[in-house]
Amino acid sequence: MSPKQVTCRYFLHGVCREGSRCLFSHDLATSKPSTVCRFFLRGQCAYGTRCRYDHVKPCNGTVFIPPQEMSPVLSPPPLFPAQEAAVPPTIPAPQRREKKTLVLRDRDLCGASVDPALQPGCITESQGSEGEAKPHSYLEAICTGLDESQDPASYPGAPQQLCPFAQAGECHCGDSCPYLHGDACEICGLQVLHPHDQEQRRDHEKLCMENFELDMERAFAVQASEGRVCSICMERVYEKQSPAQRRFRILSDCNHTYCLTCIRQWRCARQFDNPVIKSCPECRVISEFVIPSAYWVEDQSKKDELIEAFKQGMGKKLCKYFDQGRGTCPFGGKCLYLHSYPDGTRAQPEKPRKQLGSEGSVRFLNSLRLWDFIEDREQRGVPNAEVGKLGELFMHLSGADEELPAPFN
């Protein structure tokens, strides 16, 4: 038998790669097996033009259904004469409109070359008795609804969220991004301005301007602090090795420059009197406050703001002398630290009472108790010579040196 008389089995399945060069026959007339897509005959082929079977209608117009898919039809059993008399006559049902089966098909997967009027289940405008529209597939209905939906900007109360990636600097979605891309801010350069919300634009521009002014002030402060030299160690403060030492100590009543380490050593010295320690090492002007700062401050108004911020910061720390009511603070109401009890109640400020000692020392007396005097007397040492003199004086005053009278015989 010649190969041309044998039908190509790959061609029957629509996957023959040889085409006209194939040695076997590509004639469907001589092939007994049918290559017509049975799903196409029912209008349910999801592959469309990519289907390997033929999408053609039979010439006689009959639809071939495979035997395995035919449902068995059960014929009613024959009726006996007695049963035929008992069966009531059939009443014709009112004419109802025949329901037409609608098949949902993907528009992208359906065969584009096939005439829609030839596909079963499809209803054209001419077929409908009342001008019914062509039914859409599920995917087509969704896409059509999305395309015809109204723009969210037309709704006055619709929420419009700005794209977080565009706000950070770059959005890879571009024009296809589902979020709203804002206008670029002239100060920060980011797309953070809402195109429709004027209040949001004003708030952001105000906040951005405040941050810009703070950055400018910080830049000017750094520029003014770069060339400052400590008056004690004669080193540039910003050129010290440790970053923790690159800080200034601002004196409240003096404009001389000192670093953090040098002025701390000066204020902690014990070989000098208190007025000397509190005064400036160079001009001898007494300063009550020494404030640490990362930038050099020379203007008096800036110093006042710095002192106020320093007081507020110290007022949040507990005083180690007061010790939540268990101790006594020698500074009283002038202490910068927090005086509070364990329950959080603030202590009432009281003025410290001062007492000048015999040696010229000053003592702070906040509370006077008898036991304090007893402890002071016991702890105070008395020389032995003074003890002997006190004993002789006591004996003289008591009359112990007088001769006792002679006893009666």
Curated annotation (Swiss-Prot):
PANTHER family, alphabetized: E3 UBIQUITIN-PROTEIN LIGASE MAKORIN-2, MAKORIN-RELATED
Record has Transcription as a keyword: yes
Tissue-specificity statement: In adult males, highly expressed in testis, small intestine, large intestine, stomach, heart, liver, kidney, lung and muscle. Consistent with its role as a neurogenic inhibitor, expression is much lower in the brain, and also in skin.
Record keywords: Cytoplasm, Developmental protein, Differentiation, Metal-binding, Neurogenesis, Nucleus, Repeat, Transcription, Transcription regulation, Transferase, Ubl conjugation pathway, Zinc, Zinc-finger
Enzyme class: transferase
Subcellular location: Cytoplasm; Nucleus
InterPro entries the UniProt entry points to: MKRN-like, Znf-CCCH_4, Znf-RING_euk, Znf_CCCH, Znf_CCCH_sf, Znf_RING, Znf_RING/FYVE/PHD, Znf_RING_CS
Entry superkingdom: Eukaryota
Residue intervals of every RING-type zinc finger in the record: 230-284
Biological function: E3 ubiquitin ligase catalyzing the covalent attachment of ubiquitin moieties onto substrate proteins. Inhibits neurogenesis and axis formation during embryonic development by modulating the phosphatidylinositol 3-kinase (PI3K) pathway. Acts downstream of PI3K and akt1 to up-regulate gsk3b mRNA expression.
Keyword Heme on entry: no
An MF annotation (GO) of this entry: ubiquitin protein ligase activity
Catalytic reactions of this protein: S-ubiquitinyl-[E2 ubiquitin-conjugating enzyme]-L-cysteine + [acceptor protein]-L-lysine = [E2 ubiquitin-conjugating enzyme]-L-cysteine + N(6)-ubiquitinyl-[acceptor protein]-L-lysine
Record EC number: 2.3.2.27
Organism: Xenopus laevis (African clawed frog)
One GO BP annotation of this record: axis specification
This protein's name: E3 ubiquitin-protein ligase makorin-2
Ranges annotated as C3H1-type zinc finger: 2-29, 31-58, 157-184, 313-342
Gene Ontology, cellular component aspect: cytoplasm; nucleus
SMART domains for the chain: RING (SM00184), ZnF_C3H1 (SM00356)
Major site of localization recorded for this protein: cytoplasm
Region (Makorin-type Cys-His): 185-214
